[in-house]
């Protein structure tokens, strides 16, 4: 039986003074799997991700997740522009493992190798890096906590097609090498089909269908999913 590294039961979060949010969501992610959360923009994907990662507190439901690493859509917004990359990585290590702070040089070298970056990036500020390099730094920072699961919130949507493919390839490698579970959130159908082995479909804050990737793509059961998959990219 597969080990669950993250499970959500009957989760509901509604934004204050609004009817927007997510309602009665239940899902799970097994160790070593890449699970997709697919839906149109504004359907609640990022809200759900923020609830799972602790950025938002749900009004109802239960979340049981082991150690989480979070990859943002645009890591330029999450990286301190006034600090060089080397400092950012050191502080991430210090925050997550203060007792091992003295090992930071070795840890940083290893993590840069994992995300396929040269050590020269350490002396640069985030705005001096390309979008692909910043996203790799974001992935490196997420990995520094030794997570059991990565939540990847639209991790390639801000990148051009060539760089998208490179980052997707890297995420696949990390999944295979580390047996790392990944919750991959996207509105790009082609990307989700390429990388995910199980998919949840979200519409207006509610789950409408779930299933193994190829089964869902070849034989969807809901009318909404059928219409959704007729397009190759959701605006």
Question: What positions do the PLM features span?
Answer:
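A short, proline-enriched helix->beta-strand linker immediately N-terminal to the Walker B motif
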Residues: 144-148
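Helix-to-loop junction immediately C-terminal to a conserved catalytic motif
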Residues: 53
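The feature captures the beta-strand-to-loop junction immediately N-terminal to the Walker
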Residues: 38-40
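Conserved ABC ATPase signature
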Residues: 125-129, 133
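Conserved ABC ATPase "signature" region
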Residues: 102-120, 229
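A short, surface-exposed alpha-helical micro-motif characterized by mixed small hydrophobic
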Residues: 192-194
């Amino acid at each position: 039986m597969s080990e669950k590294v993250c499970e959500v039961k009957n989760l509901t979060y509604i934004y204050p003074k609004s009817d927007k949010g997510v309602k009665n969501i239940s899902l799970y992610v097994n160790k070593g799997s890449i699970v997709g959360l697919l839906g149109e923009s504004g359907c609640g994907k990022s809200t759900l991700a923020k609830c799972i990662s602790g950025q938002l507190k749900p009004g109802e439901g239960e979340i049981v997740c082991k150690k989480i690493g979070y990859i943002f859509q645009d890591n330029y917004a999450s990286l301190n522009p006034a600090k060089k990359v080397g400092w950012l990585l050191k502080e991430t290590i210090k925050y997550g493992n203060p007792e091992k702070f003295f090992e930071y040089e070795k840890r940083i070298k290893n993590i840069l190798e994992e995300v396929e970056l040269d050590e020269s990036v350490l002396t640069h500020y985030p705005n001096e890096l390309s979008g692909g390099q910043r996203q790799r730094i974001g992935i490196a920072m997420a990995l520094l906590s030794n997570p059991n699961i990565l939540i990847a919130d639209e991790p390639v949507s801000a990148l051009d097609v060539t760089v998208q493919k490179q980052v997707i390839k890297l995420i696949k490698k990390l999944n295979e090498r580390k047996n790392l579970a990944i919750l991959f959130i996207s509105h790009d159908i082609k990307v989700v089909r390429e990388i995910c082995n199980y998919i949840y479909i979200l519409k207006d804050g509610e789950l409408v269908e779930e299933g193994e990737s190829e089964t869902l793509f070849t034989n969807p059961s809901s009318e909404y999913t059928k219409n959704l998959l007729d397009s190759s990219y959701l605006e």
